Amino acid sequence: MWGPGVTAEGLSVAPAPPPLLPLLLLLALALVAPSRGGGGCAELACGERERCCDATNATAVRCCKLPLHAFLDNVGWFVRKLSGLLILLVLFAIGYFLQRIICPSPRRYPRGQARPGQRPGPPGGAGPLGGAGPPDDDDDSPALLRDEAAAGSQDSLLDSGGGGRGRGGGGRSDPSCASEHEMRVVSPVFLQLPSYEEVKYLPTYEESMRLQQLSPGEVVLPVSVLGRPRGGVAAEPDGGEGRYPLI
């Protein structure tokens, strides 16, 4: 005698929702039914994952893949194309982390601070003009490498220039007596190449090549050449540019 949704006390109650199980079953059947292949198309027997398709020609009948399987095939093809790139990225990441673990970056110490196990220099000796302080802590910096290369070239110039002047009476002291600090801080302006008087008696390139081709017994030099001091001002025997012909 009571209508639906009305209780005995006269209060209205919402009707119960329909069960979800039948809806889920219908949805599953709708998804599975299109993916089920098989069967035949006139005289053709389609495979398990194929179905009959309408061709452009009404009389032609053919089998085609199901939409779900065609989509999965396209995804698999795309993943195979990217598999090489993905493998390279994974190998790069592994190598990077191994390099960071095996070869960590060196610690940077502030300028003037001694490393562990190194004696600190006296105050004021760690600057660019301090000769007794420790070298710059940043050993692998490009500026320090350039300074060391410049110091080596300056040392070679000092050796060649100072030695020639000492033998020729130029009055310059032996550069070996100079301290390492003086060699490092000396300005390139004061470094000069040997004078022409000191090197004009050296053989030319052609003469050097001829001397290398000749045996030691065939090379004979004048007595005046052997007795002439380097940088001397005696008269040149051939009247040329100070070079002696080979005899």
Curated annotation (Swiss-Prot):
Membrane topology: Single-pass membrane protein
Signal peptide range in chain numbering: 1-35
Annotated Gly residues bias: 160-172
InterPro entries: DUF4719 (IPR031696)
Protein name (record): Uncharacterized membrane protein C3orf80
Gene Ontology CC terms, in alphabetical order: membrane
One of the Pfam families matching this protein, by short name: DUF4719
Principal location class: membrane
Location of region: Disordered: 109-179
Keywords: Glycoprotein, Membrane, Signal, Transmembrane, Transmembrane helix
Domain of life, source organism: Eukaryota
Residues listed as glycosylation sites in the UniProt record: 57
TM region(s), chain numbering: 82-102
Subcellular location: Membrane
Organism name: Homo sapiens (Human)
